[in-house]
Each structure stands twice: as structure tokens, then as C-alpha cells.
Design a protein with these regions (language model features):
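Short coil/turn segments at alpha/beta junctions that flank glycine-rich nucleotide-binding fingerprints
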Residues: 81, 98-99
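Short alpha-helical
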Residues: 11, 64, 109-113
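Short amphipathic alpha-helix that is part of the acyltransferase structural core
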Residues: 1-31, 46, 126
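Conserved acetyl-CoA pyrophosphate-binding loop and the N-cap/start of the following alpha-helix
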Residues: 78, 82-90
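Conserved active-site alpha-helix within GNAT-family acetyltransferase domains
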Residues: 85, 101-102, 108-132
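A conserved beta-strand-loop-helix scaffold within acyl/acetyltransferase catalytic domains
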Residues: 32-50, 55-72
Length: 132
């Protein structure tokens, strides 16, 4: 069965929380994703195998011209099949239809090739400050 990519789909909080836990580890937490995305995101994309959510990406925004790519997640059994790249591509295509001019992303060094080569992001100088 093929992977179906859905833009701004109706989010099932349990399903997305499970995917997030699988992709990032840590303790499982049920997150109110649907309401959070409605309040803070310009767009989001899910990758589905039938009814199973196997990938997700989100673009939070500042209310203006900038969006921030967050939560790129692919379930462990679905990795290395270009699902992450396609998620970002669908998200970028959707954002191009909006007033967003800049899409930012922060990533760990081991993801540099994914974001720069596969997804087309350019490197810039940036900073981060841990608050807690």
C-alpha cells in the first residue's frame, strides 16, 4: 500500500502522540496536538499508510512572514524511504500558497545532510539558549 500525504489533516491526538514518542523516545505523553496546531501552526502534513500515521511535520509561525519547521517525525519502521523528505516537500509546497516568506529549521549535526541536501535548506548563523 502506498503512503498518502495529507496537508492540514484532522489530527488524532493519541495517534500523533504515539508517533512522536516512537520517533523521539522519552516518556509517552498524550499531547493535545489538534488544538496546539490550530493555535500555533501555519500548516502540518501527515504521512499515512492506510489509517496509520507513519510520519508528520509541522510549521509553527510568528503570525507574520516567518514559519519554523518542527516535529519532523517518521516512525522507526518507516525510516529510510524518503518519507521525511516528502513530508517537508509537501509542507513547503503548502506554505508557498500562504504569506510565509521564510521557513526556518534548527537541527542536530547528524541531520545536516537531510535538511541541507535532501530538503534544500541553506546554512545560516544562528544561536540557541537553553532555558531549563
Amino acid at each position: 500500500m502506498a503512503i498518502d500525504f495529507r496537508v492540514r489533516f484532522d489530527v488524532d491526538d493519541v495517534q500523533l502522540s504515539q508517533l512522536h514518542h516512537d520517533a523521539f523516545g522519552g516518556n509517552y505523553e498524550l499531547v493535545p496536538w489538534g488544538s496546539r496546531l490550530q493555535r500555533h501552526s501555519k500548516s502540518w502534513v501527515g504521512a499515512f499508510h492506510g489509517t496509520v500515521l507513519c510520519g508528520f511535520v509541522n510549521a509553527a509561525w510568528d503570525g507574520g512572514k516567518h514559519a519554523f519547521l518542527l516535529d519532523t517525525a517518521v516512525a522507526t519502521e518507516w525510516r529510510h524511504q524518503a518519507i521525511g523528505t516528502r513530508l517537508v516537500s509537501y509542507l513547503v509546497s503548502d506554505l508557498r500558497t500562504t504569506d510565509i516568506e521564510w521557513l526556518h529549521v534548527d537541527y542536530e549535526e547528524h541531520l545536516a545532510e537531510f535538511y541541507s541536501v535532501a530538503c534544500g535548506f541553506e546554512s545560516t548563523s544562528a544561536g540557541v539558549l537553553r532555558l531549563k
